[in-house]
Amino acid sequence: MKSDDKTYTQALSRRPLNVRRLWEEEPVGLFSGRDIFAAAKENRAIVLAANARHPITAKGVLRAAKKHDAAVLIEIAKSEANYCGSNFSNLPEYAVNYSRELGHGAVFAMHVDHYGIKGRDDVMKAVTQMGEVTARGWTSVAIDASHLDDWNNLCATRDVAMHIPPYFGLEVEVGEIKGPGEFSTVEEALYFIGGLNSWGIFPDLIAISNGSKHGTYDKTLGQNEGINFERTKAIADALKPYGVSIAQHGISGTNIETRCSQFAQYGIVKGNVATLFQNIVFGIKMEPETGNAVIEGDSYVKEADRGIPAELWDEIVAWCDGKGMSRKSGDYKKANLAFCDKILALPEKYLNRIVDETEYWTERFIKAFNAEGTAEKVIERVCRRTSWNPLPDRKIIAHRGDYRADNAPTKGGNDGGDYSE
């Protein structure tokens, strides 16, 4: 979309208040997740949510988004912000700067992914941190208290949500995303979303455990993508009265043209991709159909003509060896922070090939997700409202007394693992 388009210019005056406070004079197309999710849902499209573990990822994603007039999300998870160069403080500024380099016109939201809550201390910290992310220009949040049992998940999610501006996009989660074989149930989802509704909390999206996993599917161990579309649709259909759709996590390793292209049929509106974009930065060999990292000889395979230079990859391998990691470990993600500045300082030829490949894969997702043209739909939606505020016109239809600790579907807690991203 052209940054001087009349409707785009009109929509800029209706961006979220926190965005206008920071970038009133900057024609950056940063909007609320509420508007982007609603526009995608209306048009049977899926929004690509790209985890920018390295800031340069955001540039390639925004370039593809502008080229195809597709609304996207740039995101980072709470845990990722502790081991990546991107964090809650700097990623919005990086995204706005990259948008400026492109001449603006890209339509996107800044999404706090997997804001993990594992107990009371995290809830109390969130009271302060939600104010901080608002001040930094974020426009959407995913609360993830799925580590807790259903009753405490409901209570913690409710308490944190009450400290998020209601004009932000809101995603919640029930059932930890662990991989094939352990699925969220319709009963859990109805209890969770009904309970939130009874307190006046209106999520746009719910993340569920439906067979996907975060990170790499290790084919040498027989791991394969196993998204259960039937369970996904059953939950999506059950939640229609609440206006809640599905956020699909763990997409890296999923066939883009044959599987991702089906998502909209099953109530999915948002698609998260993280590890694939990290693979691009590092130049790790990937399956061409899925973006899953190829493992050979118990090791990732570095391709010399992709991503960072081989010499820098050797430094990363040595660093990870020093931390006791296997050479196919998912913990290679923790090298992002240690090597962020070195990557940003690389000669242009390396940065350009990272951005170019990021753009290529983003385009594939946009097309498979039927997301071309969704940026224009977001702008139209923003402009036809009587107010700038995208808070949806939903009603409380559930009764608080029906959602108690004693009738929660599950009473147990987490198994001790960390599946947050």
Predicted regions and their residues:
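Catalytic cores of alpha/beta
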Residues: 119-132, 180-184, 188-189, 252-267
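Hydrophobic faces of well-ordered beta-strands that scaffold small-molecule active sites
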Residues: 46-52, 72-76, 106-116, 139-143, ...
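Active-site glycine- and acidic-residue-rich loops that bind
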Residues: 52, 147-155, 174-193, 250-257
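Active-site-adjacent beta->alpha loops and helix N-cap segments on the catalytic face
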Residues: 88-92, 122-127, 146-168, 217-236, ...
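Active-site beta->alpha loop and helix N-cap motifs at the rims of alpha/beta catalytic domains
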Residues: 76-163, 169
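Glycine-rich phosphate-binding active-site loops on the catalytic face of alpha/beta enzymes
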Residues: 136-151, 210-212, 254-256, 265-285
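C-terminal extensions of enzymes
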Residues: 1-21, 319-421
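Catalytic-face loop-and-helix region of soluble metabolic enzyme cores
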Residues: 103, 238-246, 257-343
